[in-house]
Amino acid sequence: MAEEVSSLMKATVLMRQPGRVQEIVGALRRGGGDRLQVISDFDMTLSRFAYNGQRCPSSHNILDNSKIISEDCRKELTELFHHYYPIEIDPHRTIKEKLPHMVQWWSKAHSLLCQQRIQKVQIAQVVGESTAMLREGYKTFFDTLYQNNIPLFIFSAGIGDILEEIIRQMKVFHPNIHIVSNYMDFSEDGFLKGFKGQLIHTYNKNSSVCENSSYFQQLQNKTNIILLGDSIGDLTMADGVPGVQNILKIGFLNDKVEERRERYMDSYDIVLEKDETLDVVNGLLRHILYQGDCVELQGS
């Protein structure tokens, strides 16, 4: 008798191969918490895409929209967005074609930010005054992973200092979290002078960002993965993990839904269409971790 996770019955859930999803979920359940790790994007994956019909800000947007950025800088950043975002999500261009454009976009944006005399002490205030929100169910998600010793690797092309501060202000920044992102580099007098390490953009979230390898080496028994993303570029986030046995890829389809649905369904095992919650992920975690929890299961 196949057991079904009831959260997968949600209207927002799309699956190209439900049978295959069932097999992967079964394997994850047999492995339990001891074998599991979660690898996730942040912006528009753990954070909300929209609330009450209004777009929510990404970690870059939070800074772009803040009062510590000059009007001229904001205008230039907006122009960059209107030029490059359509390229980022264009279904007719290959990732290889998009790559140089993404590097240009991030590099230009970071260069503009470095001209703004941004101070480290301003970050918490900027986040506190923003409209950033984590997805509904975030507390259950973060707390469940922490309580069950499941590592959460957040791989973000956003701004590490900002997203870390969001998680801290939401009071779910637990010790099981490891973040790789674009972290700000401040001068001795506390002003932003650049960004540390290799630039991370939408389409190089893979093992080429070499600082991940030692992290994954420590987790060699964590051979089962739940991967969460909202772009095609997020699909490579687990590429640096050695010895993967089972991986369940869950994609949030937030924007340009009609034109991107087929591509997402071909790429992700589970697609969540315009779903601003973590209900499905939390339901799966319950099913995997709490073997006796039959409330979440429906016999077929």
Curated annotation (Swiss-Prot):
Annotated positions of the N6-acetyllysine modification: 256
Residues binding substrate, per UniProt: 156-157, 205
Leading EC class: hydrolase
CDD domains hit by this protein: HAD_5NT
Known EC number: 3.1.3.91, 3.1.3.5
Main location: cytoplasm
Keywords: Acetylation, Cytoplasm, Hydrolase, Magnesium, Metal-binding, Nucleotide metabolism, Nucleotide-binding
CC annotations in GO: cytoplasm
GO BP, sorted A to Z: nucleotide metabolic process
Subcellular location field: Cytoplasm
Reaction catalysed by this enzyme: N(7)-methyl-GMP + H2O = N(7)-methylguanosine + phosphate; CMP + H2O = cytidine + phosphate; a ribonucleoside 5'-phosphate + H2O = a ribonucleoside + phosphate
Residues the record marks as active site: 41, 43
Subunit structure: Monomer.
Functional summary from the UniProt entry: Specifically hydrolyzes 7-methylguanosine monophosphate (m(7)GMP) to 7-methylguanosine and inorganic phosphate. The specific activity for m(7)GMP may protect cells against undesired salvage of m(7)GMP and its incorporation into nucleic acids. Also has weak activity for CMP. UMP and purine nucleotides are poor substrates.
UniProt-recorded name of the protein: 7-methylguanosine phosphate-specific 5'-nucleotidase
Organism: Mus musculus (Mouse)
